[in-house]
UniProtKB/Swiss-Prot annotation:
Family indicated by similarity: Belongs to the archaeal NMN adenylyltransferase family.
Highest taxon above the source species: Archaea
SUPFAM superfamilies: Nucleotidylyl transferase
Organism: Thermoplasma acidophilum (strain ATCC 25905 / DSM 1728 / JCM 9062 / NBRC 15155 / AMRC-C165)
Substrates-to-products reaction catalysed: beta-nicotinamide D-ribonucleotide + ATP + H(+) = diphosphate + NAD(+)
Protein name (record): Nicotinamide-nucleotide adenylyltransferase
InterPro entries: Cyt_trans-like, NMN_Atrans_arc, Rossmann-like_a/b/a_fold
Main location (coarse class): cytoplasm
Molecular function GO labels: ATP binding; nicotinamide-nucleotide adenylyltransferase activity
Biochemical pathway: Cofactor biosynthesis; NAD(+) biosynthesis; NAD(+) from nicotinamide D-ribonucleotide: step 1/1
HAMAP family reported for this sequence: NMN_adenylyltr
Pfam families documented for this protein: CTP_transf_like
Amino acid sequence: MESRKEKRAFLIGRFQPFHKGHLEIVKRILSENDSIIIGIGSAQYSHTVVNPFTAGERHLMISRTLEKERIYNYYLVPIEDVNANSLWVSHVEALTPKFDIVYTNNPLVRRLFMERKYEVRSLPMVNRKEWTGTKIREKMIAGEPWENDVPDPVVEVIHEIDGISRIRQLSTTDEDITQ
């Protein structure tokens, strides 16, 4: 009897923060694959308005969410940027378990993996008007409700790390502080 090869997918994102659209995408990818590697991209960046959370904080957001959803067939891998696009896929391969298929809508990521002969699939956009990291961060800064845009464990992590205060402070300029 021939055993079936496990099909493993790769997804990369900054997840600043991990939101309900990301969760839906993970579920859809897992409906087509046995397991998923979630690359926490730009892992070296934190404490900026665009990248307010550390790789470790994003890891907590994602792992707690997936645990609550009873999803266990995943790997979380922090992936730092490299300054040479031609080397990036090799960098990813060195950091992750082997994978068969890549899911992305990013044109550069798509191109780089296709050049290395990976199967690359597009992701469905889920409630893109509300569920984007940029929009959620803007809501946090403006004091608007954002909690319904992210899974409950993400809300908990952001409160634990005082993330709202952090992103609001990061969004001010030195002129704001001196006035």
